């Protein structure tokens, strides 16, 4: 086993470990998280080889990169001594890369030193590298990572408190955030999900090539785009046909996939009420990833009559001799629906359609009431794997991730029980008072 240094970002800390664990599980890697510290951007792990490190981190969003660990110290002198104390120093560290082209890089966390970098690099002369320096396309990149204690919240430190050194093995997929930035997307809306957490959600849901991912509340397709990025074939539906159709041939969900060169990953989107799902029963859905409507922009609705008695008989109405509901311009009636009921339907559908081990991941809003317990929906055949919270001012949204364990699992269930305190939409507009 070899030691590797993982360098992570200090954002969305509630999601970071879930992403790392999910990616490790996706590639069948055994990672010891006993030394993981959510408050630190550094995590030293043991892996069998570089390939395992590459597999683990190549699609991660909440890390920066992973490095073959060579040593650490509170000062540069301590670092050099620690490197030379490594049991594999001569055989694996010095000789293996003796003739490789290389370059040095510096990374700084919460500060920056005014030290002369060239002089610092010269202190590593004992490594005995004889290969040429190549700043553009080196075979190896050796990285000095300096950790600082900031002077204040807005002022970084000047002297590093800890220095790490390692060989770059794999940089993360964090650059995908720039590619999928909403500002550059042809088709987006007020409810479009941000690129970073869309991609993180897809990682935790274990969206992968050779599978089908379904978003039953697709909207403008943010999660479909994230699923396509990770190689899944994606299909979506939404009760609002306007969202599905977009604003023309050049401004719709399909146009987004065309812009990213991923049209081959896009199966289709359908105007459909999820609670009256029309997808055939034998369609294999490997992953369900979605952001159900909270009822903030508008109330949650499904197909049906708000007042069934008043609607009675109108279902057979004809226009020009044709059943009204068969016409292309037909707009079906809709009725209000509770968020709790919608989530119950989502869990039940997932238990029926996902394969054993398949994941359901969705976002759920909650109010930040200190004296009220948040009750998440549960299903007897689904294991709640992660409950990741993103907090705002007076409310939060949670990424809930479930694994389908099948009919023999017999977990807890709260189907049909009112879990939400009052109506989330009403409370939102009343400032949660």
UniProtKB/Swiss-Prot annotation:
Matching InterPro entries: DNA_methylase_N6_adenine_CS (IPR002052), RlmKL-like_Mtase (IPR000241), SAM-dependent_MTases_sf (IPR029063), tRNA_mtfrase_TRM11 (IPR016691)
Enzyme class, first EC level, given as a word: transferase
Protein keywords: Cytoplasm, Methyltransferase, RNA-binding, S-adenosyl-L-methionine, Transferase, tRNA processing, tRNA-binding
Disulfide bond sites: none
Catalyzed chemical reaction(s): guanosine(10) in tRNA + S-adenosyl-L-methionine = N(2)-methylguanosine(10) in tRNA + S-adenosyl-L-homocysteine + H(+)
Domain of life assignment: Eukaryota
Keyword check for S-adenosyl-L-methionine: yes
Enzyme Commission numbers on file: 2.1.1.214
Major localization class: cytoplasm
One Pfam family named in its UniProt record: UPF0020
Effect noted on mutating residue 215 to A: Abolishes activity
Cellular component aspect of the GO annotation: cytoplasm; cytosol; tRNA (m2G10) methyltransferase complex
Outcome following mutation: residue 291 to A: Abolishes activity
Other notes: Present with 2020 molecules/cell in log phase SD medium.
Function: Catalytic subunit of an S-adenosyl-L-methionine-dependent tRNA methyltransferase complex that mediates the methylation of the guanosine nucleotide at position 10 (m2G10) in tRNAs.
Subunit and partners: Interacts with TRM112.
Name of the protein: tRNA (guanine(10)-N(2))-methyltransferase
Organism for this UniProt entry: Saccharomyces cerevisiae (strain ATCC 204508 / S288c)
Lineage, uppermost ranks: Eukaryota, Fungi, Dikarya, Ascomycota, Saccharomycotina
């Amino acid at each position: 086993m070899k030691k590797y240094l993982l360098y992570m970002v200090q954002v969305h800390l509630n999601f970071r470990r879930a992403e790392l664990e999910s990616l490790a599980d996706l590639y069948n890697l055994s990672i010891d998280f006993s030394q993981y510290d959510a408050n630190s951007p550094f995590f030293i792990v043991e892996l069998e080889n570089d390939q395992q490190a590459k597999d683990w981190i190549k699609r991660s969003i909440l890390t920066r990169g992973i490095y073959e660990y060579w040593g650490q110290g509170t000062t540069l002198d301590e670092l050099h001594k620690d490197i030379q104390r490594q049991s594999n120093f001569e055989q694996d560290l010095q000789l293996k890369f003796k003739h490789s082209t290389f370059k040095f890089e510096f990374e700084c966390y919460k500060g920056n030193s005014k030290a002369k970098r060239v002089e610092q690099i010269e202190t590593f002369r004992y490594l005995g590298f004889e290969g040429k320096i190549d700043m553009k396309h080196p075979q190896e990149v050796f990285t000095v990572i300096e950790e600082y204690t900031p002077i204040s919240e807005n002022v970084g430190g000047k002297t590093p408190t800890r220095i790490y050194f390692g060989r770059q093995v794999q940089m993360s997929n964090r650059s995908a955030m720039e590619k999928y930035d909403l500002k550059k997307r042809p088709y987006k809306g007020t409810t479009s999900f941000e690129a970073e957490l869309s991609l993180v959600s897809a990682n935790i849901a274990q969206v992968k090539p050779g599978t089908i991912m379904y978003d039953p509340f697709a909207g403008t397709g943010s999660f479909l785009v994230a699923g396509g990025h990770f190689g899944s074939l994606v299909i979506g539906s939404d009760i609002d046909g306007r969202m599905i159709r977009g604003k023309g041939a050049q401004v719709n969900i399909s146009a987004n996939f065309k812009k990213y060169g991923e049209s081959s990953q896009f199966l289709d989107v359908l105007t459909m009420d999820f609670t009256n799902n029309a997808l055939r029963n034998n369609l294999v859905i490997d992953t369900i990833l979605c952001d159900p409507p909270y009822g903030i922009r508008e109330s949650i609705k499904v197909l049906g009559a708000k007042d069934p008695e008043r609607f009675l008989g109108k279902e057979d109405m004809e226009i020009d001799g044709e059943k009204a509901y068969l016409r292309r311009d037909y707009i079906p009636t809709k009725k209000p629906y509770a968020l709790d009921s919608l989530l119950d339907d989502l869990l039940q559908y997932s238990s029926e359609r996902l394969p054993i081990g398949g994941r359901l991941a969705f976002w759920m809003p909650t109010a930040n009431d200190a004296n009220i317990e948040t009750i998440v929906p549960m299903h007897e055949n689904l294991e709640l794997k992660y409950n990741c919270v993103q907090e705002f001012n007076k409310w939060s949204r949670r990424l809930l991730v479930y694994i389908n364990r099948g009919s023999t699992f017999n977990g807890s269930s709260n189907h049909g029980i009112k879990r939400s305190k009052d109506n989330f939409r009403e409370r939102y507009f009343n400032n949660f008072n």
